A protein has these predicted regions:
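Conserved, mostly hydrophobic/aromatic
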Residues: 42, 51, 97, 121, ...
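Non-cysteine beta-strand/loop elements that form the S-adenosyl-L-methionine
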Residues: 139-149
Length: 150
């Protein structure tokens, strides 16, 4: 197989798997604010709300400053930090809005469960579909951040 054939195959593979990539804005290691215990916090890119008082306004735009990240890369990071989690810690997905990328997160949540890592989702609750239902069924804790009601 020639180099150009390999490049073409890699491009096709990346297009096929684009839905499986996760748009990550940033990480916080040893976080203590976003869920119980010590946590790896993954701030995701993209949100369905445009709150004027947003704590993370740079995560709102779905095409903002983010890195397309393979689920396996996040898994490796979580597993490497697992000794610090203790009995109460784990990983928290925040944002942005995690349910904005529910379909891409489902395989990662399954892998995290296999590793025995506690999963928390910090959500605005504004997206509800079958993917979100499945995502929540895999999570150990959902933190619902109510933005407004009447």
């Amino acid at each position: 197989m020639s180099f150009s054939s390999l490049s073409w195959a890699a491009n096709v593979f990346s297009l096929i798997n684009i839905e499986q990539m996760i748009r990550v804005h940033s990480y916080e290691s040893l976080g203590t604010y976003d869920g119980p215990g010590i946590r790896l916090v993954v701030f995701l890119q993209g949100c369905n709300f445009r709150c004027l008082y947003c704590a993370n306004p740079d995560t709102i735009d779905a095409k903002g400053e983010s890195k397309e990240t393979a689920p396996e890369d996040i898994l490796k990071m979580a597993v490497s930090q697992k000794p610090f989690f203790g009995k109460k810690g784990g990983i928290t997905f925040s944002g942005g809005e995690p349910t904005f990328q529910a379909k891409a997160l489902i395989p990662l949540f399954r892998m995290l469960k296999e590793e025995g890592i506690h999963i928390c989702v910090d959500t605005n609750g504004g997206i509800w579909n079958e993917d979100v239902k499945e995502l929540f069924s895999l999570a150990d804790l959902v933190l619902l951040d109510v933005k407004e009601f009447n």
